[in-house]
Amino acid sequence: MKSYEELLSDIEEDMELMGSSHIVYSMEEDGVVTDYDYLPSDSCTISITLKELQEKLQLQMLYTKVSAHTAGADKNAPKLAVVFPGIGYTADKPLLYYTSRLAGKHGYQIQTVSYGNLPENVKGDSEKMKQAFDLALEQTERSLSSIDWNSYGSILFISKSIGTVISSAYASRHDLTVKSILFTPLAETFSLPLAGSIAFHGTADPWAETDSIQKLAAQKEVPLFLTQNANHSLETGDVLTDIFILKTTMERVQRFI
């Protein structure tokens, strides 16, 4: 099987010859691109443009890199997953609930951070947002103060919205090597070290502008999975569509875990 670099090199050459609009058929194994051709080889092939295939491969290359971030962890030591909710998006809501279940299935102990009472109506108010962040980080320090991080082989942070800022700040402050799942991160999240992180963003998220999040994620080399027309909860309002989005998201989460 060709490496990502070899496939990307092939695609760049083909784009020079044929242009980015040329339709190709990509072959996948477990959701990972392994090769491409110009004619369908079977009913399972997927028709996309060369440019789209290039972007897909670049995303997968980053994904493979961050997935290996904790490869040196002691496989025999206990594993811990910590959930950092949003202000209104609690740990019992779909993204955090099902990710926690998947982590538990993979042998992680689960701990959820509680922030206590935080300021309301923080959207668009930088002063209130800063106050909420400071209070939440202070509560996080208290909530996790008894944990001996050195006793765990693998640490997974699962976070949502403002929780993505809290989890990243906490990991940086304590110099922790973690894998991190960032659901609907804020722009402020990307001001922090994010090695070993993947992110999910909805293009209709009123809390974070898509172009900005894409640029910030690219700068930090964070694999960013976009969900079209989805809001800050990665939902569109259509029940069946939202169930499909949740399923697709959890499949990506499971591969990462």
For the regions a language model picked out, list residue spans one by one.
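Short beta-strand/loop motif that positions the catalytic acidic residue
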Residues: 199-201, 205
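Conserved alpha/beta-hydrolase "acid-adjacent" motif
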Residues: 206-212
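A conserved short beta-strand
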Residues: 176-185
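Acidic, low-complexity, intrinsically disordered interaction modules
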Residues: 17-49
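Catalytic histidine-centered segment of alpha/beta-hydrolase-like enzymes
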Residues: 230-244
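Gly/Ala-rich beta-loop-alpha elbow adjacent to hydrolase catalytic centers
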Residues: 158-167
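Serine-hydrolase catalytic machinery in alpha/beta-hydrolase-like enzymes
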Residues: 59-151
